[in-house]
UniProtKB/Swiss-Prot annotation:
One of the GO BP terms on file: tRNA wobble uridine modification
Catalysed reaction equations from the record: carboxy-S-adenosyl-L-methionine + 5-hydroxyuridine(34) in tRNA = 5-carboxymethoxyuridine(34) in tRNA + S-adenosyl-L-homocysteine + H(+)
Origin species: Syntrophotalea carbinolica (strain DSM 2380 / NBRC 103641 / GraBd1)
Protein's name in the database: tRNA U34 carboxymethyltransferase
Entry keyword Membrane: no
Length: 324
């Protein structure tokens, strides 16, 4: 694990953040190796797999393809299937891994298809993906040949999914750190593009989060923000009393005008909403590759336009803005 994190640190390069970042990564490596039970279990499973060399990969497909069935023996195929199932829940995808279709909870390819046409070219850019999960979007970004595509994923099981996939893909410009955004040392103006998707509604202080994102971007850099929003054109936000769609950690759902005001106050300009989409069962659904509930369980069974708590059903907006 330390080698992987060291490589990420080297890819980021030198700067005033280097000492603090190296110290933090050493501590995170120790936690993943010695303390976190899930990470130790998943690392042991990875180490039991033979070294598999994929003869094929396709990052441009909606379903990312790694290897073919012919790359494995029958015994290796069963062992790989069992290992992949042990890494559940698979949230972001989908994938085809050596002929094994991993049908993830989210059809992340649908979100990417909605957002990608509106992005500034990613080639040669330093990119940050906050809450990168298994790295699906990082892998889609890699197809554009950025200088660096760096993910932040603090949840050890999801970070270990990234480690497993990168073990086969070996994408040199793609890296991931097991950190929360607020743990990242100050790196003023380092990134050209930041993706912050499906995270803002989990922030107790969205304004502070947006200010930090602005500080990490160079002037003129691009923020790609996707979040749950409240339907309507008034400048207001919903603060759920307890849970929203069975999630305890949802703090604010702004309308799009309210979100645009937040972005303006945090130091962004040229703010444009490029997509508003109600979450559908096609995009988020239960599959054998998760062992948790999914969207049908979060909605009122007698009225799918409402959550189980009676709030508006999930509506997501994608907003792109430039740092002033």
């Amino acid at each position: 694990m330390i080698e992987l994190l060291s490589a990420a640190g080297q890819a980021i390069g030198n700067g005033p953040w280097q000492t603090a970042l190296n110290t933090l990564l050493n501590e995170k490596s120790r936690q993943l190796t010695d303390v976190d039970g899930n990470a130790r279990r998943l690392t042991a499973l990875m180490n039991q797999l033979p070294d598999l060399l994929p003869s094929h990969r396709n990052l441009a497909s909606g379903r990312i393809e790694i290897g073919t069935p012919e790359d494995l023996t029958e015994t290796q195929h069963q062992a790989l299937y069992d290992t992949l199932m042990a890494f559940r829940p698979w949230r972001k995808g989908p994938f085809n891994i050596f002929g094994i279709p991993v049908d993830t909870e989210w059809r992340s390819d649908l979100k990417w298809a909605r957002i990608a046409p509106h992005l500034a070219p990613l080639q040669g850019r330093r990119i940050l993906d906050v809450g990168s999960s298994c790295g699906y979007y990082l892998m889609r970004m890699a197809e554009a040949n950025p200088q660096l595509a760096l993910g932040l994923e603090p949840y050890p099981p999801l970070f270990c999914q990234y480690v497993l996939l990168q073990r086969w893909l070996k994408l040199p410009q793609v890296h991931c750190l097991p950190l929360k955004l607020e743990e990242l040392p100050p790196m003023d103006g380092y990134f050209d593009t930041i993706f912050h998707m499906g995270v803002l509604y989990h922030q107790r202080s969205p304004h502070e989060a947006l200010k930090q994102l602005a500080s990490l971007l160079r002037p003129g850099g691009e923020l790609v923000l996707e979040t749950l929003v409240l339907d309507g054109d008034q400048d207001l936000a919903l603060c759920p009393r307890d849970r929203y769609a069975k999630m305890r950690n949802v703090f604010f759902l702004p309308t799009v005008p309210c979100l645009e005001a937040w972005l303006n106050k945090a130091g962004f300009e040229d703010i444009r909403c490029v997509d508003r989409s109600w979450t559908t069962i096609e995009e988020q659904h239960p599959t054998p590759w998760i062992n948790t509930e999914s969207l049908p369980d979060f909605l009122d069974p007698s009225d799918p336009t409402r959550t189980i708590e009676g709030y508006q059903a999930p509506l997501r907006a994608a907003v792109i803005a430039r740092r002033r």
